[in-house]
Every structure is written in structure tokens, then in C-alpha cells.
């Protein structure tokens, strides 16, 4: 009778040991995925940090879009007794462009409104934003549906700070 009692724990241990070597599936997040910034684009600004933020806000508004928020990460860090480089995220968009996309693919609401980070490191000011093709990747939205809206926002950012 002792033999069957020993076999069950050994079998369970073998199964658990086998599970430890199961490869990661596509649905599981990679430990390095959050570290991968290849989904972003950046433009070196020819303006100061504050001027870059101001120019982007004005350009967005001039195109009829709304600036929903400007998040000052440096100020938030300072309030917590921490220090960091200047970094502001401008959150912007227009329901006219975003709503049809969210109706077609409700989960796309996680990608909107659009955002642009302005940061300064080593004396260099950059505008960093998500690549449009990567934003729509894996969604039911085709590039043709955003090339005259989301892609135009990329062009606006580039022209506003880089030209």
C-alpha cells in the first residue's frame, strides 16, 4: 500500500517540474517588453524645453484639437522629494478623429487621446511620441483609416519642433 502513496507525490512533482520549462506564450507579457522603446519616435527640438512645450500646445490648438492635460512629471517628482530632468506629457486629440476609431475598436480607447512627451537630457530637448503604426498594431483599425488623422499629428509634432 505504501507504493501508491509514494507514486502520487512523485507524479505531482514531475508534472510541476515539467511546467517550469514551458516556453512563454504570445499572450504572456515579456519581462523586457516594457523596456522596449522601439514603438516610439523622437524629434530633437531646436527650441528650449519651455518653448517646445508652448509651441506644441499652440500647434495642437491651432489645428482644432484639444489639449486635455499637460502632465509635469518633474513637478510631481519634486512634490515627492525627488528630482528628475524636465519632462512634460501633453495629452491631446479631437473626438472627431478618435470617436470613429473607438466605435470600431472599443479597446483602442486605451491608445487615445494622443500623447507627446517633451523632455530634456544632457542639454538636448526631445519630443517623443508613439508611432502610429504601432498604436494600431493588433487592432481592427487599418493604416488607411488613420493616415489623415493620427499620422498628421506625427507630422505636426515634427514640423513644430524640428523645422
Describe these PLM feature segments.
Residues 1-8:
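Bacterial N-terminal signal peptides that target proteins for export
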Residues 20-22:
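Bacterial signal peptide processing site
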Residues 115-143:
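Beta-strand/loop substructures that line and gate deep hydrophobic ligand-binding cavities in soluble
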Residues 25-83:
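N-terminal secretory signal peptides
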Residues 57, 61-118:
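Compact, glycine-rich, soluble single-domain proteins
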Residues 15-18:
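C-terminal motif of bacterial Sec signal peptides marking the signal peptidase cleavage site
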Residues 133-163:
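C-terminal partner/receptor-binding element of secreted or periplasmic proteins
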